């Protein structure tokens, strides 16, 4: 594998799982993963393949380059650098008057993604990911696992493209153009899988978590969600139970969530597994 020297790059942002760098003339971005473990290589290779696939579908995303490794063992991916860009959540947190126009832009980008059918074998079905996550979750009994899978089978299959980590922090804007980023979780299935995740992050998580994700408080995140609903659903309101069910499935593929046992019990009893409602 090709190596890369970080002395030739300048860090410009840090996220929980990676640090981001620019080259000298800021034409390329380097995403350096914090975990030093070759087990992440398949995910990196998949992220590269998915980025190329997504571009071919007409969904705007920075052009992907190649995989490298630093001398101390960190894996990296190069991307086209989008100049003068900000994530939608960062821009809104700095000027909340941008919330409405930017949520309209995000809703339009989401409609393009969700309106695109995905038949590629490199993109997994969200139900398969859910079942895998459920099987690896030690806090779920065999009986509950069987009950949840039975419930899962009743969910519709649509086969549309899904971002997989859908929230305003994973959409950037530059000169009025919106790009989708961080596509390692890209999958296919029902659009509510994505929408439910945004609901969970904006309206369910406590304020401290939202400050970390969105750079804003719980109330502002809820207002942002409501504006997204306005433009994505065009006047109608999503069903709260549906949002919760799909968010539950998404969170099961991100199994570090400590709320999973409570979510499982409430979901099986037929109740929305989250205590808070959308603003």
Question: What does each model-found stretch correspond to?
Answer:
Residues 17-44:
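ATP-binding glycine-rich loop module of kinase domains
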Residues 85-124, 145, 152:
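Conserved kinase catalytic-core helix
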Residues 77-85:
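Short pocket-lining segment of the protein kinase catalytic domain that shapes the ATP-binding cleft
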Residues 195-235, 249-266:
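Active-site activation/catalytic loop segments of kinase-like enzymes and analogous catalytic loops
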Residues 2, 115-164, 168-169, 174:
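An alpha-helical support segment within catalytic cores of ATP-dependent transferases
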């Amino acid at each position: 594998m090709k190596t890369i020297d970080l002395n030739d790059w300048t860090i410009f942002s840090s996220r929980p799982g990676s640090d981001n760098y620019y080259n000298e003339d800021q034409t390329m971005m380097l995403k350096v993963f914090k975990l030093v473990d070759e087990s992440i290589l398949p995910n990196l290779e998949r992220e590269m393949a998915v980025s190329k696939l997504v571009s071919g579908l007409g969904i705007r995303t920075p052009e992907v380059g190649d995989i490298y490794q630093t001398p101390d063992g960190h894996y990296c991916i190069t991307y086209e650098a989008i100049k003068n860009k900000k994530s939608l959540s960062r821009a809104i947190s700095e000027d909340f008057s941008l919330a409405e126009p930017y949520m309209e832009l995000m809703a339009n980008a989401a409609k393009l993604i969700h309106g695109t059918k995905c038949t590629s074998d490199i993109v997994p079905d969200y139900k398969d990911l859910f079942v895998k996550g459920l099987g690896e979750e030690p806090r779920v009994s065999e009986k509950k696992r069987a009950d949840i899978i039975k419930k899962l089978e009743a969910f519709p299959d649509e086969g549309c493209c899904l971002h997989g980590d859908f929230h305003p922090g994973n959409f950037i804007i530059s000169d009025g153009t919106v790009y989708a980023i961080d596509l390692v979780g890209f999958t296919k299935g029902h659009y509510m899988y994505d929408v439910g995740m945004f609901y969970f992050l904006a309206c369910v998580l406590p304020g401290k978590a939202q400050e970390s994700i969105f750079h804003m408080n719980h109330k502002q995140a809820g207002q942002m969600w409501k504006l997204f609903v306005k433009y994505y659903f065009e006047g109608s309101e999503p069903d709260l139970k549906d949002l919760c069910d799909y968010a539950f499935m998404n969170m099961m593929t991100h199994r570090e969530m400590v709320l999973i046992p409570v979510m499982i019990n409430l979901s099986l009893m037929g109740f929305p597994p989250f205590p808070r409602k959308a603003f």
